[in-house]
Amino acid sequence: TGTNYGFAFDIGTTTVAGQLIDLNDRNILGTRIAFNKQAVYGSDVITRIIYASNTAGLDKMNEAVLDNINEIIQDLCSAQKIALSDVYCIVCAGNMTMMHLLLKVDPTNIRKAPYIPTTTVFETIHAPEAGIEINPKAIAAFLPGVTTYVGGDIVSGVIACGLAEGDELSLLIDIGTNGEIVLGNKEWMIGA
C-alpha cells in the first residue's frame, strides 16, 4: 500500500516509449513516446554499433538513451504530480543492440560473424547504477533476449500475448525499424 509507482520502457531503434504505472492497482497513468536521441549517431543499429566502437562512442550512446528515459520519467511524474522518490521499479525491453547500448555493454560482436552478443541476460540492478533518476533504492530490470536478433522486445511480446501458453499456432509480428516475427505455441517457437 501507499505510493508505489513503476515504469515500463520499450527502447526502440527509432523511438523510446515509456509508461507510468500505479503498481498498487496496475493502472497505466500515462504514456510518452520520444524519438531515440541516439539517432544523431546513426539511424540503424549497425551504424550505431560502429559508432559505439569509437572512442567515447559507447558513452555517448548510453547518455543519449538515458536522456530519453529520464526525460520521459520526469515528464510523466510531473504530469501526475508524483515524486521521483515514489518510483520503485523500472523494466526495460529492447532489441539486443539497444539493450547493450543502454547498459554500456560492448555491442561489437552483434555485427560480426558469428553474430553472438556479449550477453543475452542483463543483471537486475538499482536504477541509479544504470543512470536512471528515480528512487535510489528502486530496482531496474532488463528483459533478456534469446539471441542477436531476438531481443527482450520480442521476449516481452511473447509474454504479453501469451504465445508460450497457447495450444493454437500463433504469429507475433513486431513492426518497427527492425522487424521481427515469432511463430509458435506452448510446444515450440521459431523467431527471425
Regions found by a protein language model. Give the residues of each.
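N-terminal glycine/serine-rich phosphate-binding loop of ATP-dependent small-molecule kinases
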Residues: 1-101, 109-111, 141
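Conserved mixed alpha/beta core segments that line enzyme active sites in large multi-domain catalysts
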Residues: 4-6, 140-174
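Glycine-rich phosphate-binding loop of actin/hexokinase-like ATP-binding domains
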Residues: 12-13, 18, 26-44, 109-124, ...
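Glycine-rich phosphate-binding loop and adjoining helix at the ATP-binding site
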Residues: 44, 87, 101-156
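Noncatalytic linker/hinge segments flanking ATPase motor cores
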Residues: 58-62, 73, 128-138, 190
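Alpha-helical multipass membrane-protein architecture
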Residues: 63-67, 148, 177
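Short, well-ordered alpha-helical packing segments
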Residues: 70-77, 91-93, 155-159, 179-182, ...
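Short, glycine- and charge-enriched coil/turn segments that flank and shape catalytic ligand pockets
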Residues: 78-83, 133, 164-167
